[in-house]
Amino acid sequence: MNYFPIFANLAGRPVLVVGGGAVAARKISLLLKAGAEVRVAAKHLNAELSALAAENKILWLAEEFRAEHIRTVFLIIAASSDQALNRRVFHLAESCQKPVNVVDDRDHCSFIFPSVIDRNPVQIAVSSSGSAPVLARLLRERLEALLPPSLGDMAEISGRWRDAVKGKLKSVTERRRFWEKQFNGRFAALVKNRQNTLAERELAKQLEQNYQGGFVSLVGAGPGDAGLLTLKGLQEIQQADVVLYDALVSDGILSLVRRDAERIFVGKRARGGRTPQEDTNALMVRLAREGRRVVRLKGGDPFVFGRGGEELETLARHQIPFSVVPGITAAVGATAYAGIPLTHRDYAQSAVFVTGHRKADAPDIEWQTLARSRQTLVIYMGALKAALIAERLQQHGRSPDTPAAVISQGTLPAQKTATGTLANLSELAETAPNPALIVIGEVVGLHEKLAWFGENAKKESNPAEHAYFALDGLGTGQEQQAA
């Protein structure tokens, strides 16, 4: 963090602006909106500033800048066309420990101006730390388009009702959940339609009927890249009181969780320790019964080998209300980032997803079905049984020359794709770090041509015979989107 984001209360505070031209006028316009007492040090003013001085909206000192002008002001802005003067202002302000900004000269600023989205009293500031002001402006324009003009009205109405809500709902958690519900419900829709009177009636009604019970959201976190989390999923984790997450949820996803939410790891891996599923189920029920908003955050999609169905059965049995937010499953995300299409008119007319980690009493796998040609087979959690998988598929007719891949840490910067054939699948799996996904089928042969993730999609040798690695993901999904 190059700059600490802070909002300053300038109402009634003296602010010195050095310069009387168009640049100074732009800064003065913003300062006046904030209620600052603006003093202008310049021998001449342009027409816009002359009009403001004539209306007594600014104090024109009618002289060139002098060191004495700094003594009694709160902060200083140097906006003259004289660079030497601007830098002199900077050094004098620094010697007095006064905040100072020299316009368009980042090296001579103790603070900088962000791009601002103004929905008074709501304000959003966007900054590139002075590195890319055009990028900051473009981001501001996008945010302007997303945020309704009624946002300010919503904040003002909420402010008027704040004491009433505080009197009715005693805990911070209750109040936060109440407001989150209003800002995502009918109250917000009424304000957006400029029906403010009806909106306040809706607030009164909701406050009287406020539901205090807990709730569980089962959220799919996607395959790893935070940019692949759904918008609904993001909303849920930012409204949660507590998040129960597993080992497949990436750090990038966890960084998006509401900062004051409690985080509890309930993960499990095939090679390591585990939290028993029964304990996770019981924990969800207990937290919901405490009146908390719980998010059960699971890697990939919760209903694709994620035991999400079992967890919801528990919630339903205990009459805990819940919702489900699907996620991009690893088979879809990791193969896309590896340049391996799951289906292709020339190679595969179907795709089959199976798990290599089953219950002890599960029925036998239909290997004959899995060994069919012209289909793509994707195996989750199969790295430990890669040798058995390859053997059984070949026994049931799949050619040992069938292309195969093991994708590790799919969609993350460290993603690696090892390719070879069914004959050496076990060697590929042995060298692949977890979590790993096995892909078998002719479409794997397209990887070398279609690999795109990472700036250069570089290749490096693999000690396993007939195999290679593609070093994918030199940057995160967020960076690619921002670029």
From Swiss-Prot:
Keyword Transferase in annotation: yes
InterPro entries: 4pyrrol_Mease (IPR000878), 4pyrrol_Methylase_sf (IPR035996), 4pyrrole_Mease_sub1 (IPR014777), 4pyrrole_Mease_sub2 (IPR014776), CobA/CysG_C (IPR006366), NAD(P)-bd_dom_sf (IPR036291), Siro_Cobalamin_biosynth (IPR050161), Sirohaem_synt_dimer_dom_sf (IPR037115)
Disulfide bonds: none
Binding site for NAD(+): A22, V23, K43, H44
The protein's Enzyme Commission number: 2.1.1.107, 1.3.1.76, 4.99.1.4
Keyword match NAD: yes
Reaction it catalyzes: uroporphyrinogen III + 2 S-adenosyl-L-methionine = precorrin-2 + 2 S-adenosyl-L-homocysteine + H(+); precorrin-2 + NAD(+) = sirohydrochlorin + NADH + 2 H(+); siroheme + 2 H(+) = sirohydrochlorin + Fe(2+)
Residues engaged in binding S-adenosyl-L-methionine: P223, G299, G300, D301, V304, T329, A330, M381, G410
Residue positions of the active site: D246 (proton acceptor), K268 (proton donor)
Pathway annotation from the record: Cofactor biosynthesis; adenosylcobalamin biosynthesis; precorrin-2 from uroporphyrinogen III: step 1/1; Cofactor biosynthesis; adenosylcobalamin biosynthesis; sirohydrochlorin from precorrin-2: step 1/1; Porphyrin-containing compound metabolism; siroheme biosynthesis; precorrin-2 from uroporphyrinogen III: step 1/1; Porphyrin-containing compound metabolism; siroheme biosynthesis; siroheme from sirohydrochlorin: step 1/1
Positions of modified residues (Phosphoserine): S128
GO molecular function: NAD binding; precorrin-2 dehydrogenase activity; sirohydrochlorin ferrochelatase activity; uroporphyrin-III C-methyltransferase activity
Keywords: Cobalamin biosynthesis, Lyase, Methyltransferase, Multifunctional enzyme, NAD, Oxidoreductase, Phosphoprotein, Porphyrin biosynthesis, S-adenosyl-L-methionine, Transferase
Region (Precorrin-2 dehydrogenase /sirohydrochlorin ferrochelatase): 1-203
GO annotation terms (biological process): cobalamin biosynthetic process; methylation; siroheme biosynthetic process
Entries under Gene3D superfamilies matching the protein: Cobalt-precorrin-4 Transmethylase, Domain 1, Methyltransferase, Cobalt-precorrin-4 Transmethylase, Domain 2, NAD(P)-binding Rossmann-like Domain, Sirohaem synthase, dimerisation domain, Siroheme synthase, domain 2
Role: Then it catalyzes the NAD-dependent ring dehydrogenation of precorrin-2 to yield sirohydrochlorin. Finally, it catalyzes the ferrochelation of sirohydrochlorin to yield siroheme.
Family under the similarity heading: In the N-terminal section; belongs to the precorrin-2 dehydrogenase / sirohydrochlorin ferrochelatase family. In the C-terminal section; belongs to the precorrin methyltransferase family.
Name of protein: Siroheme synthase
Species whose genome carries this gene: Neisseria meningitidis serogroup C / serotype 2a (strain ATCC 700532 / DSM 15464 / FAM18)
